[in-house]
Amino acid sequence: MSRDRGVCIGVDTSCYTTSLAAVDAQSGALLSQRRKILPVPMGQCGLRQSDALYQHVLQLPDLFRQLLSDSKEFAPYHVVCVSVSKTPRDVEDSYMPVFRAGVAFANVMADSFGVPLYETCHQTGHLLAATAGSGDEPERDFLAIHLSGGTCE
């Protein structure tokens, strides 16, 4: 990647996975992604939000280091924007504490790099990833059904 092309960093801290991605700002090509599932203690059915938030705080710095080391072609000064899932859904009062870890981390990155921060919702991220992963740009509006552990839309 040439020096004049930028990288967008995406951050998502959902109920069970810490996720980071680096995307070519011009082409939209995925350059690197790192994910780590949150550990659930043996015998437990899940994680409390407070425990999950804490695990994200622990995992984000190392995942970011790994993301940067995945591709020596981009360096921090090539970052042109940061995007983060702020809420589970794009509706008023949609809130889960786990997303605060990602928002805090993304704010620090955006401020450190002096770049804009774009906030989105987790559910929209799933839909955008699906359309990007299909290889085809949608030519018109489409109907999508999203089924997840915590939300259906």
Stretches with model-predicted labels:
Residues 1-153:
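Short acidic/glycine-rich loops and adjacent helix/strand connectors
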